[in-house]
């Protein structure tokens, strides 16, 4: 459909449409889309070279490179970039864009900021992303995941109060989505992730009430039928969240509450 409409698109949109053809090279479904990730990243590099001042293109290009080696950008032992990854190119592209945005007063770009956080959170120097985290924080108040993203850096730098506060804001935003769409969707994974982060931050702060409130609210919005959904296999991602109240009781030494807790037979019970 995009290719059919390409003639009426802008020049940059036409190059993006052409690049997508490298991302999805067959009309038939395949088991592993990663086989085309390199082709797509190479195509997006060409788009970027022609449009390096377009921050939408910056975000799409960086994402394409990062998805070649997801969660394998830095060697956790040496702290060096993984040799087969595009880590340093991502760093150069994103830091150039961020410097330009800060220098010319352009509108902060959530995609650029979001990806920089993901790039730096597994690096040996996550603190380099603290300003970017603050720039993304509250930038799009109704986007729960983006309210949350700054805390990927906060938690690594010991800013646990911000972890609790920003994930509380994310949970508030997510409630709007939940009230409209319910729990039976993949976004419930992202909602649970925000509750989990709030719980984690509260445990580091020694704050029992926000910790237990977070886990109770999370469990209340993860019904058993969601966990048992087979396609997509939601239990693969969500079942572990159901055990987190036990973790909270142990962390705070609430042994009587732990002994009194009912055995969880199914999620939400």
Language-model segments: which ranges?
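Short coil/linker segments at helix-helix boundaries
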Residues: 1-53, 60-104, 113-123, 132-135, ...
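TPR-repeat structural position
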Residues: 37, 87, 125-126, 160, ...
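Alpha-helix capping and inter-helical loop/turn segments
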Residues: 70, 124-127, 249-254
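Catalytic-core region of carbohydrate-active enzymes that cleave or remodel glycosidic bonds
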Residues: 152, 157-169
